[in-house]
């Protein structure tokens, strides 16, 4: 059995790490590099960095901090933010990132997924999906430009259908960002994760809702996700990654030690 991954998420805006609730009202958490170092030292398996306004601003992620992060940590990390071309992705990988993640650009140009997978290998290509449960329709809908409150909008895609589409096009991994749960710390949306897991045959990462250690255990044991991503519980030192791994091991969850 492959070990389950614990992945701190660092949302980056104007060169600093920020955190919001349900993708809104972001507060500044701190500088990128010291946080990355701290998580690597605590035992994180991987880090994910989202430049949350890059796509909505029409620019590519700022690569200067990518190089600085690569110099100080020895665990894999993934970078997302406005990557629209193979050239954009190549530069980020050259600066030291192990993976690139695309979200809004993939919705605008689904062929980009295939182009990147063919050029760099599927193991480098992550597709992030921002999924929102619409109580009026009773459906999970994919959203775009979620880093900008004024531009964020629903797309034509239902979540399950988009998951299947991105896999066909070459996504090597999917991060499911459950918008309703984001930052509220009352647990991952297990029902949604199980729905997606049924059709997802690539590694699936849960994102949005972690507040207690048991929430990680529930995601791993009840939905069989490959990794769990969290932000505020790590940023605010509510949960220590080393202690979380000890707890998960006690719950018979295979983790890297």
Swiss-Prot record:
It is found in: Cytoplasm. Its EC number is 4.3.2.10. It is an enzyme of class 4 (lyase). Its main location: cytoplasm. Pfam families: His_biosynth (PF00977). It catalyses: 5-[(5-phospho-1-deoxy-D-ribulos-1-ylimino)methylamino]-1-(5-phospho-beta-D-ribosyl)imidazole-4-carboxamide + L-glutamine = D-erythro-1-(imidazol-4-yl)glycerol 3-phosphate + 5-amino-1-(5-phospho-beta-D-ribosyl)imidazole-4-carboxamide + L-glutamate + H(+). It comes from the Bacteria. One of its GO terms (molecular function) is imidazoleglycerol-phosphate synthase activity. GO terms for cellular component: cytoplasm. One of its GO terms (biological process) is L-histidine biosynthetic process. Keywords: Amino-acid biosynthesis, Cytoplasm, Histidine biosynthesis, Lyase. Pathway: Amino-acid biosynthesis; L-histidine biosynthesis; L-histidine from 5-phospho-alpha-D-ribose 1-diphosphate: step 5/9. Signal peptide: none annotated. InterPro entries: Aldolase_TIM, His_biosynth, HisF, IGPS_HisA/HisF, RibuloseP-bd_barrel. The keyword Cytoplasm applies. The active site is at 11, 130. IGPS catalyzes the conversion of PRFAR and glutamine to IGP, AICAR and glutamate. The HisF subunit catalyzes the cyclization activity that produces IGP and AICAR from PRFAR using the ammonia provided by the HisH subunit. Belongs to the HisA/HisF family. NCBIfam families: hisF. Heterodimer of HisH and HisF. This is Imidazole glycerol phosphate synthase subunit HisF. It comes from Aliivibrio fischeri (strain ATCC 700601 / ES114) (Vibrio fischeri). The lineage of its organism: Bacteria, Pseudomonadati, Pseudomonadota, Gammaproteobacteria, Vibrionales.
């Amino acid at each position: 059995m492959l070990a389950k991954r614990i992945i701190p998420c660092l949302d980056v805006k104007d060169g600093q790490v920020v955190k919001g609730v349900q993708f809104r009202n972001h507060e500044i958490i701190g500088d990128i590099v010291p946080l990355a170092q701290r998580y690597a030292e605590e035992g994180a398996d991987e880090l994910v960095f989202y430049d949350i306004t890059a796509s909505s601003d029409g620019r590519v992620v700022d690569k200067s901090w990518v190089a600085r992060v690569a110099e100080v940590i020895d665990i894999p990390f993934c970078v997302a933010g406005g990557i629209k071309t193979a050239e954009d992705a190549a530069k980020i990988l050259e600066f030291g990132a192990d993976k690139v993640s695309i979200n809004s650009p993939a919705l605008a140009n689904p062929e980009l997924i295939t182009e990147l997978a063919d050029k760099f290998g599927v193991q480098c290509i992550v597709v992030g999906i921002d999924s929102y449960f619409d109580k009026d329709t009773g459906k999970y809908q994919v959203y775009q430009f979620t880093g900008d409150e004024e531009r964020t909008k629903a797309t034509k895609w239902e979540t399950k259908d988009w998951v299947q589409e991105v896999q066909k096009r070459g996504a090597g991994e999917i991060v499911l960002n459950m918008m309703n749960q984001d930052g509220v710390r009352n647990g991952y949306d297990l029902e949604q994760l199980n729905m997606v897991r049924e059709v997802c045959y690539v590694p699936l990462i849960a994102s949005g809702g972690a507040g207690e250690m048991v929430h990680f255990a529930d995601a791993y044991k009840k939905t069989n996700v490959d990794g769990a991503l969290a932000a505020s519980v790590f940023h605010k030192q509510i949960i220590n990654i080393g202690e979380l791994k000890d707890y998960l091991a006690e719950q018979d969850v295979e983790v890297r030690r």
